[in-house]
Amino acid sequence: MSERLTDNPSLFRLRVRYGKRDRLKYLGHLEVIHTIERIVRRAGLPYAVTQGFSPHMRVGFSSALPVGTSSTCEWYDLFMTEFVALDEAFGRLAAASPADLAPIEAAYIDVRTPALTAQLTRLSYRIDLHLDPEAPVSADEVHRAIDTLRAGHGIDYARGKKSKRLDLDHTLVGYE
């Protein structure tokens, strides 16, 4: 099936970076997918559909973001059947998007480019600490706490009935 899509000379691939902020950070990944599909339909872009028994919009997403996490660097690839000028496509997507899920940038890429999930192999998080002004904590204390966590090489935690171990040797590669 992917060969049919990549061999099609009239197929265009628009890579869009978008943000997931404020109220919409509480949407799950499937809800984000459905919302983006509605945005594309409202924008009137000529999207491609998959082949097969149950055709659906040909769009690929980066890895799922944890529910409740804001981001300004989420991605999706939209396959289109007709070329639309980049400024026009971006403007139509922006006009059809809610502010908390708006596109930040877009670019056409080669249709044969590997999927986003194959390209994005690392995630980077920024944590903003909102500390109590009555009990100030210095940056050195925060760094020492992280170093203590790393010295144990992991954190055991329970999620539901399963207990897991988060490997911090690979998770906390660098921090400021």
Regions found by a protein language model. Give the residues of each.
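Short, flexible turn/loop "capping" segments at secondary-structure junctions
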Residues: 8-9, 68-72, 118-120
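Internal, well-folded beta-alpha domain core
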Residues: 86-176
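Charged, low-complexity intrinsically disordered regulatory segments in eukaryotic signaling
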Residues: 1-8
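Short, charge-patterned binding micro-sites
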Residues: 48-81
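Ordered, soluble secondary-structure elements with a strong preference for glycine-centered loop motifs
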Residues: 25-30, 47-48, 83, 87-88, ...
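Short glycine-/aliphatic-rich beta-strand segments at the starts of folded cytosolic domains
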Residues: 13-20, 76-78, 121-130
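Extended, well-folded interaction surfaces typified by the phenylalanyl-tRNA synthetase beta subunit core
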Residues: 11-12, 17-19, 23, 27, ...
